[in-house]
Swiss-Prot record:
Complexes and interactors: Part of the ribosomal stalk of the 50S ribosomal subunit. The N-terminus interacts with L11 and the large rRNA to form the base of the stalk. The C-terminus forms an elongated spine to which L12 dimers bind in a sequential fashion forming a multimeric L10(L12)X complex.
Domain of life where this protein originates: Bacteria
Protein name: Large ribosomal subunit protein uL10
HAMAP family: Ribosomal_uL10
Provenance organism: Ehrlichia canis (strain Jake)
Matching InterPro entries: Ribosomal_uL10, Ribosomal_uL10-like_sf, Ribosomal_uL10_bac, Ribosomal_uL10_bac_type
Length: 160
């Protein structure tokens, strides 16, 4: 890899680490181009992304940004999934892992100031996403309004 290519890759990695709040670092073995294509496509629909990284350059970027505690996780064939919604990308990766048993293994996740283990990532995958929570709240509100109105009208009728 030429020095100019390394500098470009380094700036891309630094840009990802500074732009996005959440990262999941995963190891991949035996993934073919179609696997990456389908995973990237799903992530893109969720306003997220995936980047295969060069370990040594990632360590340099992390050191520059003061996140050296993550450097130990960069060994082997690594990719980073980045987003502003960790639950959504956790769900996508968990689904991909379920469909493709031995192709990826989660190493850790990074949440602004904290390193999260792979079990925590899988726990996040079991939680409802922000959009699903909004839908649940709206359905509870829209269900309760007519019931409360009926109870109020009934109470008024009983009062008179």
């Amino acid at each position: 890899m030429k020095r100019s290519d390394k500098e470009l890759h380094l700036s891309k990695v630094e840009g990802l680490f500074s732009k996005f709040k959440y990262f999941i670092i995963a190891n991949f073995q035996g993934m073919v181009a179609n696997d990456f294509f389908s995973l990237r496509k799903e992530l893109k629909m969720a306003n997220s992304g995936l980047m295969v990284v060069k370990n040594s350059l990632s360590r340099i970027a992390l050191k520059k940004m003061g996140r050296e505690e993550l450097s130990a996780k960069f060994f082997g064939s690594i990719f980073i999934v980045y987003s502003d919604d960790i639950i959504l990308i956790s769900k996508i990766l968990a689904k991909f892992m379920k469909d493709n048993k031995s192709k990826i293994s989660l190493l850790c996740a990074y949440d602004s100031n904290e390193i999260l283990d792979s079990e925590k990532v899988l726990y996040f995958a079991s939680l409802p996403s922000l959009r699903e929570l909004h839908a649940q709240i709206m359905s509870m509100i829209s269900y309760n309004i007519p019931v409360r109105l009926a109870l109020c009208l009934k109470a008024l009728g009983n009062k008179e």
